[in-house]
Amino acid sequence: MEQIAARVTYINLSPDELIQHAVKNGEGVLSSTGALAVTTGKRTGRSPKDRFIVKDEQTADQVAWGNINQPVEQRTFDQLWERALRYLSERAVYISHLQVGADDNYFLPLKVVTEFAWHNLFACDLFIRPSGDHANGKPSWVILSAPGLKTDPERDGVNSDGAVMINLSQRRVLLVGMPYAGEIKKAMFSVLNYLLPPHDVLPMHCAANAGQSGDVALFFGLSGTGKTTLSADPHRFLIGDDEHGWSATSVFNFEGGCYAKCIDLSQEREPMIWNAIRHGAIMENVVLDENGVPDYADARLTQNSRAAYPREYIPLRVENNRGRPPDAVLFLTCDLDGVLPPVALLTKEQAAYYFLSGYTALVGSTEVGSVKGVTSTFSTCFGAPFFPRPPTVYAELLMKRIEATGCQVYLVNTGWTGGAYGKGGERFSIPTTRAIVNAVLSGKLKEGPTEVLSGFNLTIPKSALGVDDHLLNPRKTWEDVSAYDVRAQRLIQKFRENFEKFKVPAAIREAGPSDVH
């Protein structure tokens, strides 16, 4: 394993010790909740333009290179890695031995080396703490995080003063000039998303929970569309809130913690998340008042304020961090146009179509430099920034899993209805969406009467327990039906234009929307 030279090395400190170091180092302060509060300067979200993957013989033909998966030469990586090692050699560093993947067959051992104590705490909160020597002879991946080291675009061959570089062949992840902790977890997510498909495991940007009888539900969606909120269900057991694998025999969490958005967090609406923000947790870019009390409504630092906490802080959880193959799969889409239904039942071909499309919204975007407010987007696999291989690799695996299990896939709109965003529409309330989810998970939704929504050709229920019937057909929620048709046709055209880039069987392409009539 790679040796790290440093002025002082702290290895496998406890969360309490890491918190003490972070406060002593001036990295953060303790809030009234007991959680460690930190700020990350100008980088309050991910920096997709600064993420690179080393292009070599192993990866050249396997990665979908482009604006998302930007190639970097091995030599460029090596030079920056050495610069980071020299930088860290003059400082105190924190090292923890962790793992990603809660499945004995597919986990990866990790050696996390950080300049900041709080980044190491973040890794301990979000990754899995192994019991004993659990590496089983597997070689460790090394994460090197040096947020205080700035890059020079001309000298270092990068785009700004920071970079994330993933070296899939050498099992190394390098983060320099990146104080935002989300980069650490998403880098390893990208690694697993590359490594697992050849092993017949579908990696997924989704939350997962289980019912009393062990039935499993998956919630796919971009940040801010409801994954964490809806999976933290007071009547179900959490597996995880963000990253999972689906093998032939199980669903398993990649992580050992949660990373919840905090903007406008309320104890009433999201009690499980609220109660998890305590000693041992981290609040990232949450504004505190003079008494250290968090103001979750204050977005002056960012809309993307966050809390990181271990899974153990959620009382209702699946202890072994995994479950059986899913009984229900929910694609959470946040529709700004207000033309999609609150819920629709998808065929497996429609599931592949909407999975590849990934239509949703960027809500309080997690990316640096994004426009404030809400914008619609198509994000392949409901997580385009994290999937290195061609999208059809993941879509084919999804269809294979659906065919093998017979699980029902649903499209759930957590966005607007009765009109478009900012033009008279209203967002579905969390209680309404929870009622939809409850109807899905009860199994009764797919047994009741349905109708087909024109244009989108989606099968929608005529009734759902706890939901007003008139909300189920979006066309009926608009006062001006012709205005609905115009808006729906506009979105259908966007779907078609976006889907042109995919080379897929005709059955999948034809499962998409047609003209409104």
UniProtKB/Swiss-Prot annotation:
Mn(2+) binds at K186, H205, D242. Binds 1 Mn(2+) ion per subunit. Substrate binds at R46, Y180, K186, R306. InterPro entries: PEP_carboxykinase_ATP, PEP_carboxykinase_C, PEP_carboxykinase_N, PEPCK_ATP_CS. PROSITE patterns: PEPCK_ATP (PS00532). One of its GO terms (molecular function) is phosphoenolpyruvate carboxykinase (ATP) activity. GO terms for biological process: gluconeogenesis. Its EC number is 4.1.1.49. GO terms for cellular component: cytosol. Pathway: Carbohydrate biosynthesis; gluconeogenesis. It is found in: Cytoplasm. It catalyses: oxaloacetate + ATP = phosphoenolpyruvate + ADP + CO2. Its cofactor is Mn(2+). Disulfide bonds: none annotated. Keywords: ATP-binding, Cytoplasm, Decarboxylase, Gluconeogenesis, Lyase, Manganese, Metal-binding, Nucleotide-binding. Its main location: cytoplasm. ATP binds at K186, H205, G221, L222, S223, G224, T225, G226, K227, T228, T229, E270, R306, T433. NCBIfam families: pckA, PRK09344.1-2, PRK09344.1-3, PRK09344.1-5. Involved in the gluconeogenesis. Catalyzes the conversion of oxaloacetate (OAA) to phosphoenolpyruvate (PEP) through direct phosphoryl transfer between the nucleoside triphosphate and OAA. Belongs to the phosphoenolpyruvate carboxykinase (ATP) family. Monomer. This is Phosphoenolpyruvate carboxykinase (ATP). It comes from Coxiella burnetii (strain CbuG_Q212). The lineage of its organism: Bacteria, Pseudomonadati, Pseudomonadota, Gammaproteobacteria, Legionellales. The gene is pckA.
